[in-house]
Amino acid sequence: MKKIVFLFFLVLLGGYVLLLAKPELYFDKSVDYGIFTLRARGELPASPEGVLNSAGDRISGSDIYTPGQRFELILTSGPWEYRLFTPFLKGGFFRVNPYNAAVFLAPGADFAGDKAVTASGYLRSLSGVVTAAAAWVMTLRKVMPLTYLTMGDWELRGYAELLSGGTGEFNPADACAGGDRPGLEDYRDGLLLDRLLKEENLVYNDLLLRGASKEDAERRFRRNYCGG
């Protein structure tokens, strides 16, 4: 009996791992638009053009974008689906599978209204979220997998913020004051990265090649924005 239970468990585990590696087996509806492939288990959005055109324009302006790159966006229909396909990953608006670079969008992605929402109710433009997710994907494709898994999240968040244009709701004084307001950490990391790139006369790809120190970026940020 124990062997049967164990074998059953192995079958379930194997099926789960297969779905993580090939989510298209579950999210069986898809449509291609520009540089994107949208996948869903249920109904696909009727008019994704506005969001995807806006995101595509920003993505194509990245110094680590190469023609021919495509981005797979998977629309989850509920919190359980979002968690099931992104174990051990974090992200309120999106999560990127490091194995296959698939982007899982949080439930509630509204293409018609260009709105994305976290479980806590924090809103952002969906086009900005898609752009930010693409920044993570392009970084993943640019560096070695182990480098991606061990590099500082501040670099990923910072570049995603710069490429997406942010939300426009914060200023440097907010970043200096700190706090736990939704979106503030992304904005602050964007300032850190922006300051470092400008002072060193670098583009993001240069930084990926040579590496970056958060302590150094923090010093530059405080000197320029916080008075010391």
Task: Tell where the protein language model's regions lie, with residue ranges.
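Sec-exported extracytoplasmic/periplasmic mature domains
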Residues: 60-64, 135-144, 161-169, 194-202, ...
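Soluble non-cytosolic domains of exported or imported proteins
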Residues: 42-53, 120-125, 129, 150-154, ...
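Solvent-exposed, polar/charged alpha-helical surfaces in well-ordered, non-transmembrane soluble domains
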Residues: 53, 57, 128, 132, ...
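Zinc-dependent metallopeptidase catalytic helix centered on the HExxH motif
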Residues: 96-172
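Auxiliary, metal-adjacent structural segments of Zn-dependent hydrolase domains
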Residues: 11, 50-112, 119-123
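Pan-zinc metallopeptidase signature
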Residues: 6-7, 15-21, 183-228
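N-terminal low-structure segments adjacent to metalloprotease catalytic domains
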Residues: 1-36, 41-53
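Surface-exposed patches in mature extracellular/periplasmic domains of secreted proteins
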Residues: 60-74, 145-151, 173-176, 203-209
